């Protein structure tokens, strides 16, 4: 339990004792005491509405109850400096800030671990994100999925979960056959044979042309294979080429995976047949119009879904069911999928399919990622000036840098539409959120370097009582919120809460910096302030690391 949680828990316990001492209610009758942070700092550090909740039990008006609680409160034990009754009976608590100084020592002690939960909570989460088809380049939608997914994985890990990061490689569907036939056409074209036409819905990108040329140069003997063998070969080679490029782009985007799960493996291991037989044995499938259907309406879906079409081919849904059942079999407590906006209709059917196996549907969480518009000079940018095609992740990285791209793409809740201002992302000004945050870190490093030249280094032995400036106290309170913010971001699957926190912390630091000089002739006070800003540095660095963004020491 972090310091903030300890303080809140102590306050709740002391309020509970006060209620009993005031004879307002028996211990067994006292409802849960809720502690909130007031929106306005003027209303204290914490507030509770317990006096209003107790009116029926205590049979008194809420302000009388509030006064009785205040009169019997052990303020010393509760770390409270001042108490105020407001409105109809809210109780506002102004804490004794002495407890905050422990945060400095904790940050310096834990360093890179500061903010993270010390112990695992025993929960296994499989987080699937990106999972783009290996048929072309990654684009802005994939970039948002990658940034949000990787950041969420970092946050969940810091919050004590065991997280497996997984990319589902769609290497077995019709789109891969189309990829193979597209490569085949370009392969023979490179050999001077134009008789092979591009398939309907084929891939016309420059990357396919390059793959065809490369194979024609290195493996001209492929032309002598039978058509079936040639298409089988082009399927594998095409996926290998595309996946190598995707892996490189994602790695350069500071996005990493524990597993690259092949759809083909589901067929090879017989898992699709296994789940189909299992669902049939349980009575959840039926035949109609020559097709095999799953009774997903039994589990709140709006209609039943086809598993096998009347031509004998599987729908995409069947291997997806097998894949998610495989995830459960691997011992995962919770499955989290980050899907594009076009997958919204997939949620109910996928949850319903798991329920056919007796798996509770709430074990599968699906986060729909909304669209991103790339903006430049106030105008939407849809096509690359260089290639004439949709702008790729690689081009975005080259244009604004990895740090800015990742930070901007995690600044908003994933379920909201977002305009990515590329000009702003490149600015070296306070208007650029990532520059603003990184500059705060670099500024702290500069001050620490100057202090070291004077022989002053961050120390837990500094006299923290010398930290009295209101801006310094506000800054320290913000540092103390870090672990709680991580826990909140993890529980709500909300990576943007970390970028919001980073902005707040950087803002508090800049206000403090403008209000109080750190390096002065008062050596003891300087030591205390150096320890404070080192705690801020550690917090900023760790928070930026969660988002996959660097914390530069100079700028």
Curated annotation (Swiss-Prot):
UniProt EC number: 6.1.1.19
Subcellular location: Cytoplasm
Catalytic activity: tRNA(Arg) + L-arginine + ATP = L-arginyl-tRNA(Arg) + AMP + diphosphate
UniProt keyword ATP-binding present: yes
GO biological process: one example: arginyl-tRNA aminoacylation
PROSITE patterns reported in the protein's UniProt record: AA_TRNA_LIGASE_I
Motif range ('HIGH' region): 132-142
Quaternary structure and partners: Monomer.
Name of the protein this chain belongs to: Arginine--tRNA ligase
Lineage of the organism: Bacteria, Bacillati, Bacillota, Bacilli, Bacillales
């Amino acid at each position: 339990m972090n310091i903030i949680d300890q303080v809140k828990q102590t306050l709740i316990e002391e309020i509970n004792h006060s209620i009993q001492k005031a004879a307002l209610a028996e211990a067994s009758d006292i409802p849960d005491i809720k502690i909130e942070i007031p929106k306005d700092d003027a209303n204290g550090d914490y507030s509770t509405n317990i006096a209003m909740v107790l009116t029926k039990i205590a049979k008194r008006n809420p302000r009388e109850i509030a006064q009785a609680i205040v009169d019997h409160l052990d303020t010393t034990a509760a770390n409270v400096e001042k108490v105020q009754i407001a409105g109809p009976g809210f109780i506002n608590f102004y804490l004794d800030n002495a407890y905050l100084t422990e945060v400095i020592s904790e940050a310096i002690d834990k360093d890179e671990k500061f903010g993270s939960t010390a112990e695992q909570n025993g929960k296994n989460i499989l987080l699937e994100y990106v999972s783009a088809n290996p048929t072309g380049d990654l684009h802005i939608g994939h970039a948002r999925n990658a940034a949000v997914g990787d950041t969420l994985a970092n946050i969940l890990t810091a919050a004590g979960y065991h997280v497996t990061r997984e990319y589902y490689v769609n290497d077995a569907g019709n789109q891969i056959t189309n990829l193979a036939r597209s490569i085949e056409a370009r392969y023979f074209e490179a050999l001077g044979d134009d008789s092979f036409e591009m398939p309907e819905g084929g891939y016309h990108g420059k990357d396919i042309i390059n793959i065809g040329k490369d194979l024609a140069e290195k493996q001209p003997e492929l032309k002598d294979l039978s058509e079936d063998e040639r298409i089988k070969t082009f399927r594998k080679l095409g996926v290998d080429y595309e996946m190598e490029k995707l892996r490189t782009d994602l790695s350069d985007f500071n996005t990493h995976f524990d597993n690259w799960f092949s759809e083909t493996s589901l067929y090879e291991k017989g898992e699709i047949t296994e789940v189909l037989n299992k669902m049939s044995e349980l009575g959840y499938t039926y035949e109609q119009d020559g097709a095999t259907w799953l009774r997903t309406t039994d589990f709140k879906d709006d209609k039943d879904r086809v598993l096998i079409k009347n031509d004998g081919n599987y729908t995409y849904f069947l291997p997806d069911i097998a894949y998610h059942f495989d995830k459960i079999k691997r011992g995962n407590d919770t499955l989290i999928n980050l899907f594009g906006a076009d997958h919204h209709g997939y949620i109910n059917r996928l949850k319903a399919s798991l329920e056919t196996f007796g798996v509770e549907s709430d074990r599968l969480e699906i986060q729909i990622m909304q669209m991103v518009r790339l903006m430049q000079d106030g105008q939407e940018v849809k096509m690359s000036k260089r290639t004439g095609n949709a702008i790729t992740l690689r081009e975005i990285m080259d244009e604004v840098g990895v740090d800015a791209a990742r930070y901007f793409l995690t600044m908003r809740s994933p379920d909201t539409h977002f305009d990515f201002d590329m000009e702003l992302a490149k600015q070296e000004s306070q208007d650029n959120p990532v520059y603003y945050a990184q500059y705060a870190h670099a500024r702290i490093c500069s001050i620490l370097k100057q202090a070291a030249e004077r022989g002053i280094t961050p120390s837990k032995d500094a006299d923290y009582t010398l930290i009295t400036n209101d801006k310094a106290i506000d800054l320290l309170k913000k540092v103390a919120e870090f672990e709680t913010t991580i826990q909140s971001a993890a529980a709500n699957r909300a990576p943007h809460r970390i970028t919001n926190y980073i902005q707040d912390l950087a803002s508090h630091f800049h206000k403090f910096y403008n209000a109080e000089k750190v390096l002065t002739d008062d050596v003891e006070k300087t030591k205390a302030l150096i320890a404070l800003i080192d705690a801020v540095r550690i917090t900023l660095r760790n928070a930026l690391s969660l988002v996959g963004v660097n914390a530069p020491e100079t700028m």
